[in-house]
C-alpha cells in the first residue's frame, strides 16, 4: 500500500538538455512589468515572472500611528506579503500564515537596505504585496514588485532590487526555477541584489551544492539579475516618457 502511495520523481532535465517547460538551463521565464496600476496608492506595480504574478502598493511616507512607534532618525518600513486564496491550485486560508509572516520580514529587511529611510524621520511607509498567481519565486517577485512600487511612489532609493532563484535539477545548475523544479530539484537558492552597487539584499539556500556548483549558480544568478534589472529600468523610463508625452 505504501509503495502505491509513493509519487515518482519527475525527470527535470530532458534528453535534449532542456527543462520540462522548454527552457534552456540558463533561460529566464517571460517577464512583464506594469507601473502605476492602482490610482489610490502613492505607488504601485505588477510584476509577472512566468506564471507567478504579484501586485504591490505603497502608501507614504506618512505620519506614524500610533506615534510612540515612530523612530526619531528614520522612517518605519512596514511590509505585508500575502497570497490570495485563489493564487494556488488549492484554495488557501485567507488568514496570514506563518510562512507569510516570515516572508514579510524577509522582504522588509531586503527593502530597508534599498530605501533611504533616514530622509523621513518619524514617518511610516506601508508596502502591501499580494500574490495573484503562484508558480515558484513568489518572494522574489513580490520583492521586485515592491521595489518598483516604491520607485513609482517617488521614494528615494539607493537602487532598484532585482532577484532570481537558481538551483540544481538532475545535477544541472538552472536559472529561475518553476514550481516543479522548486519541488523536486536538489537545491533552490533565491538571490536579490542592488545591481549598480553590487550588493546582495536577500540570500537563501535550501538543499546542497558543492563549492564549484555554488560558484556556477551564483554567477548564473548575477547574469539573470542584470537582465531583470535592465527590464525594471526600462519599465520606469517608459512610464516617465509616457507622462512627458501626456504633459503630466
From Swiss-Prot:
Keyword set includes Hydrolase: yes
Keyword line: Cytoplasm, Exonuclease, Exosome, Hydrolase, Nuclease
Any one Pfam family match given in the protein's UniProt record, by short name: RNase_PH_C
Effect of residue 98 to E: Abolishes exoribonuclease activity
UniProt cross-references to InterPro entries, sorted A to Z: ExoRNase_PH_dom1 (IPR001247), ExoRNase_PH_dom2 (IPR015847), ExoRNase_PH_dom2_sf (IPR036345), PNPase/RNase_PH_dom_sf (IPR027408), Ribosomal_Su5_D2-typ_SF (IPR020568), RNase_PH (IPR050080), Rrp41 (IPR011807)
Effect noted on mutating residue 99 to E: Abolishes exoribonuclease activity
A Gene Ontology BP annotation from the UniProt entry: rRNA catabolic process
Domain of life: Archaea
SUPFAM superfamilies: Ribonuclease PH domain 2-like, Ribosomal protein S5 domain 2-like
Disulfide bonds: none
Annotated GO MF terms: 3'-5'-RNA exonuclease activity; RNA binding
GO cellular component: cytoplasmic exosome (RNase complex)
EC code(s) of this entry: 3.1.13.-
Cellular compartments annotated: Cytoplasm
Assembly information from the UniProt record: Component of the archaeal exosome complex. Forms a hexameric ring-like arrangement composed of 3 Rrp41-Rrp42 heterodimers. The hexameric ring associates with a trimer of Rrp4 and/or Csl4 subunits.
Assigned protein family: Belongs to the RNase PH family. Rrp41 subfamily.
Function recorded in the entry: Catalytic component of the exosome, which is a complex involved in RNA degradation. Has 3'->5' exoribonuclease activity. Can also synthesize heteromeric RNA-tails. Binds RNA.
Designated name of the protein: Exosome complex component Rrp41
Source organism of this protein record: Saccharolobus solfataricus (strain ATCC 35092 / DSM 1617 / JCM 11322 / P2)
Lineage of origin: Archaea, Thermoproteota, Thermoprotei, Sulfolobales, Sulfolobaceae
Gene: rrp41
Amino acid at each position: 500500500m505504501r509503495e502505491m502511495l509513493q509519487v515518482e520523481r519527475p525527470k527535470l532535465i530532458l534528453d535534449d538538455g532542456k527543462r520540462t517547460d522548454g527552457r534552456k538551463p540558463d533561460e529566464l521565464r517571460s517577464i512583464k512589468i506594469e507601473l502605476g496600476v492602482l490610482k489610490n496608492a502613492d505607488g504601485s506595480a505588477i510584476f509577472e515572472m512566468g506564471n507567478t504574478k504579484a501586485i504591490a502598493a505603497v502608501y507614504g511616507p506618512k505620519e506614524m500611528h500610533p506615534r510612540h512607534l515612530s523612530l526619531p532618525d528614520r522612517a518605519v518600513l512596514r511590509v505585508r506579503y500575502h497570497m490570495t486564496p485563489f493564487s494556488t491550485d488549492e484554495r488557501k486560508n485567507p488568514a496570514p500564515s506563518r510562512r507569510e509572516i516570515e516572508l514579510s520580514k524577509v522582504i522588509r529587511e531586503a527593502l530597508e537596505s534599498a530605501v533611504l529611510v533616514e530622509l523621513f524621520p518619524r514617518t511610516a511607509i506601508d508596502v502591501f504585496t499580494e500574490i495573484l498567481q503562484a508558480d515558484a519565486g513568489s518572494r522574489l517577485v513580490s520583492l521586485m514588485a515592491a521595489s518598483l512600487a516604491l520607485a513609482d511612489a517617488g521614494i528615494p532609493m539607493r537602487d532598484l532590487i532585482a532577484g532570481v532563484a537558481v538551483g540544481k535539477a538532475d545535477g544541472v545548475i538552472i536559472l529561475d526555477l518553476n514550481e516543479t523544479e522548486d519541488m523536486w530539484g536538489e537545491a533552490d537558492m533565491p538571490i536579490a541584489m542592488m545591481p549598480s552597487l553590487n550588493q546582495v539584499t536577500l540570500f537563501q539556500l535550501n538543499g546542497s551544492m558543492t563549492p564549484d556548483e555554488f560558484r556556477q549558480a551564483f554567477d548564473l544568478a548575477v547574469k539573470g539579475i542584470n537582465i531583470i534589472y535592465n527590464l525594471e529600468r526600462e519599465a520606469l523610463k517608459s512610464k516617465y516618457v509616457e507622462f512627458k508625452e501626456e504633459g503630466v
